[in-house]
A protein has these predicted regions:
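Feature targets compositionally biased, intrinsically disordered low-complexity regions
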Residues: 49-50, 320, 332, 406, ...
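Alpha-helix boundary/N-cap detector
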Residues: 148, 152, 214, 330-333, ...
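Compositionally biased, low-complexity repeat tracts
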Residues: 3-5, 317, 403, 421, ...
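Intrinsically disordered, low-complexity Pro/Gly/Thr/Ser/Ala-rich repeat tracts
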Residues: 1-185, 189-427
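Extracytoplasmic/secreted envelope proteins and their assembly/folding machinery
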Residues: 22, 183, 197, 216, ...
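Extracytoplasmic/periplasm-facing segments of secreted or lipoprotein envelope proteins
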Residues: 410-453
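Functional cores of ribonucleases/endoribonucleases
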Residues: 445-565
Length: 565
């Protein structure tokens, strides 16, 4: 295609590729969604696999709470991927319409419909509770002694023996084999979402030139933001939540890390739970076996190997003696010790499961909304079409509206920067990056509160990109602001020419109040007073800060956010 619709470089991103990325992301969203639904289908096979006792009940409660929150975080991540898928199609359509407007003699452009995606968190079915395993508590111990003792008698003696000490408090024990199987069921979920995350990043790489530093950095930010990072994120609950993590290699993906690690650790804790159940079962069986051995020795049943009938007749007469002998030889101290070890391990595991909640809660706050990722994808796609050229090319219809003195396309401005190299050899003056979409579009009230918490500043956001562009356009259309902007731009051109240009220069624009709500804000004062109980306040205006671009000879919106006059 001809300039300005393409530029020099090793990768020439075309609208067709944006449609392909959009379609691929939609498929990956479905795969990410199915990874959890398939796991939950398997989980339904494991009802009533738990045991009795207060400690097993506590573990089951903690496990259920963690799984429920994991499902919530996973569902929000599904929605975020869908938003990204839609954003790439929107930009491809905007490009087609802009190209058609530039070349009216060409055949009319027909926009493609956005991909069918999940745009709100799915309602996943809760897995069945652990419950208490069905069956008689003593069934696991009826075969502890191969002495040919009749079933009813054996049951009577075993039950009486288990009543010594605390054994019956924890019976029936969990089905350790099924609990171990459930632990293994978590691992395919962890592997599956890992593969999908890799596919998703490969998809974005299709429209990324990693040899272009600004492009590469933007790609890393786009991918990491999909997994919950922000410009203000810090190291919280043991994870990096910033776009540019200060430690560790590569890109931070905290929400993905939480989902993956939680699955891995739940698998580990369930395996340890199963091992603890097996260990106490084995210990109690050994104690009973020893008691029966000693009881038979005391009773001198030397003819124990005779026929079943003779044995039955004889043991029947000795019921009271056998019971008394077993009870006499049961080691109550060892029984209680085995129970104590088991319950101590369960309490340890319960606390470990509870400890997973902090990262999950943070992840639930951090997952971006559908609206946020749609806007970010539009921005990344817009800039990729022109290889992150600093000469900005607006694409949306608003930028071509003759009623707008200054056309506006926030997506095409995102990541714009204006470093300046003075002609006299002074050091390079660092540019000011545009970040309206990344920091001020589609944030939830909880995300605004998290920003206040992390940065100690007021925080605000537009609900979506359309509202942001409407509010900013209103400010740009204000007649006084038009005069202010034109005067300011003329001065910037002169300063570029004489080498005195400062990238941070910005005109002081009038704040324009609209009838409609532009967004919401949470003040530091309110957060300091109420914490996460602070409520967002609706706003009807926006603060707009511009920056001048020497490369394009015009301005870009460095940032804009809802703010009361």
């Amino acid at each position: 295609m001809s300039s300005p619709w393409t530029g020099p470089g090793t990768i020439d991103v075309q609208p067709l590729q944006l449609y392909q990325v959009s379609a691929a992301l939609a498929v990956e969203q479905q795969s990410f969604h199915r990874a959890l639904t398939q796991f939950l289908d398997v989980h339904t096979w494991y009802a009533k696999v738990g045991g009795s006792g207060t400690d097993t009940a506590a573990f089951a409660t903690a496990y259920a709470e963690v799984v429920a929150l994991l499902m919530e975080v996973h569902g929000k991540a599904v929605v975020a991927i869908g938003g990204a898928a839609v954003g790439f199609t929107t930009t491809a359509n905007n490009f087609g319409q802009a190209d058609a407007a530039t070349h009216p003699g060409n055949p009319p452009f027909t926009p493609q419909p956005p991909p069918v995606v999940i745009d709100r968190p799915p309602t996943y079915p809760l897995p069945p509770p652990f419950g208490v395993r069905d069956g008689n508590p003593v069934d696991d111990f009826l075969d502890v002694f191969d002495g040919g003792i009749a079933g009813d008698l054996m049951r009577e003696v075993v039950e009486a023996a288990l009543r010594t000490g605390r054994a019956l408090e924890i019976l029936p024990l969990p089905d350790y084999l099924k609990v171990n199987d459930l632990s293994q069921a978590w691992l395919p979920l962890q592997t599956g979402i890992g593969m999908i995350q890799g596919q998703l990043q490969d998809t974005i790489n299709m429209v990324t030139n990693h040899e272009n530093a600004e492009w590469h950095i933007a790609m890393r930010q786009f991918v990491s933001s999909l997994w919950g990072t922000t410009a203000w994120g810090k190291n919280t609950v043991g994870l990096e939540w910033g776009h540019k993590p200060p430690t560790g290699p590569g890109t931070s993906m905290p929400v993905f890390a939480v989902l993956s690690t939680t699955a891995q650790l739940l698998a580990q804790y369930l395996r340890e739970y199963a091992e603890a159940a097996e260990a106490v079962r084995r210990a109690l069986r050994e104690i009973l076996h020893t008691a029966f051995q000693r009881a038979f020795a005391v009773l001198d049943l030397s003819d124990i190997k005779r026929t079943f009938k003779n044995l039955w007749d004889r043991v029947k007469k000795l019921t009271k003696g056998l019971l008394a002998a077993v009870l006499l030889n049961i080691d109550t101290g060892k029984v209680n010790e085995a129970v104590d070890i088991y319950e101590s391990k369960l309490r340890e595991l319960t606390q470990k499961v509870k400890n997973l909640m902090d990262q999950l809660r943070e992840a639930s706050i951090a997952v971006p909304t559908f609206q946020a990722e749609t806007a970010r994808a539009e921005a990344y796609a817009s800039r990729s079409l022109f290889e992150f050229d600093r000469s900005l090319y607006p694409l949306n219809a608003q930028s071509r509206d003759p009623n707008n003195h200054f056309g506006l396309d926030l997506a095409s401005m995102e990541w714009a920067t204006n470093p300046f190299q003075p002609p006299n050899g002074d050091p390079l003056r660092e540019g000011k990056d545009a970040h309206t979409i990344d920091r001020h579009v589609g944030l939830t009230p909880e995300q605004l509160k998290a920003r206040v918490r992390d940065q100690g500043v007021d925080a605000s956001a537009f609900p979506d990109l359309q509202t942001a562009e409407k509010a900013v356009q209103a400010a740009l259309n204000d007649q006084q602001n038009i005069t202010i902007i034109e005067t300011w731009m003329n001065k910037q051109k002169q300063k570029v020419a004489n080498g005195t240009f400062s990238p941070g220069s910005a005109p002081e624009l009038n704040v324009v109040t609209l009838t409609d709500v532009t967004g919401s804000t949470i003040s530091k004062a309110d957060f300091d007073a109420s914490g996460f109980a602070a409520q967002p306040v609706p706003v009807h205006s926006a603060k707009v800060i511009l920056a001048y671009s020497p490369e394009s000879g015009t301005f870009y919106v460095r940032t804009a956010f809802p703010k009361a006059p």
